[in-house]
């Protein structure tokens, strides 16, 4: 999961020499401040200058908005403002639904931190509940600059800048997202992962008028330890219904993308039983894709909570629990070896608690473990090796 905004190479924060000089001469210039907003009652994350990744700073509470007070930020009605509002709302709705399903009376622990260069993350985590061993729901936003070569969509700006022989410099960007992994205790209740994010650039300051770039990414996928077709079909039907509201080609396209992405090469199997996944999506109207991402995020509760309610109290034995731990081991392997967000965060000094919040509390590795052919465990493994059409 890796808190989706410090996660992909296209989002690397580049050093800014001017900002570095400003910090040396005026330390306060690099600070994040929650200052008097333009809109009454709103506190905005204000970033004096985009800077390189720096040490995180704990915050007492989450700001009302992560956005700057400028023409495309707080109060502008921009896509970035609407997307940020959506992920903040969805975080609250999902945490409330999970607390109700857990029934332990426990509440999500909240953790808010920022970086002076324009990063703010609001993590919410529930551990050792009645139903959930570990559940994390994070929202985050980054305001910074990308190196000119760091992302493919900025190539248009380089062409514009080449007309006068001037090479475009670093590109200002904004990114925001919600990311979550939910690990239940019961082996018959599946793990769920979802992640929805938005990325956009501004024109480089040395190439005014260059085209802005933007894209959406994300997905929702299910990772059971036991194959219960009723549950898997319900989950996939919700994904298809959501996709079909926008384009009938979305579900088959994004289902295959999901099966391909969550592939554990060294095991020759998928992490789970799929769902939908997409990235760098910008080939449709921007408002349409914003609505699509909003619908996808909103479909998490109806796709998952009914399954949890059916399975959270299913009796199980020690062998079934051990199999769940083996499958959790596969989850850990994928996240630490292949997941782009996790590996990028580990390599670039990201906040470790946010990066590893996706991992389960417990997992298991048995030497040369092979389930008996025809067993319930084997059926799950076969479906992970050979992706199926569930609808």
From Swiss-Prot:
Extent of Polar residues compositional bias: 1-13
Region named Important for dimerization: 125-134, 331-366
EC number: 1.3.3.3
Renumbered residue ranges of the record's region Disordered: 1-34
UniProt keyword Magnesium present: no
InterPro entries (UniProt xref): Coprogen_oxidase_aer, Coprogen_oxidase_aer_sf, Coprogen_oxidase_CS
Keywords: Chlorophyll biosynthesis, Chloroplast, Heme biosynthesis, Oxidoreductase, Plastid, Porphyrin biosynthesis, Transit peptide
Residue sites binding substrate per the record: 179, 195-197, 349-354
Role summary: Involved in the heme and chlorophyll biosynthesis. Catalyzes the aerobic oxidative decarboxylation of propionate groups of rings A and B of coproporphyrinogen-III to yield the vinyl groups in protoporphyrinogen-IX.
Assembly with partners or alone: Homodimer.
NCBIfam families the record matches: PRK05330.1 (NF003727)
Protein name, entry field: Oxygen-dependent coproporphyrinogen-III oxidase, chloroplastic
Origin species: Hordeum vulgare (Barley)
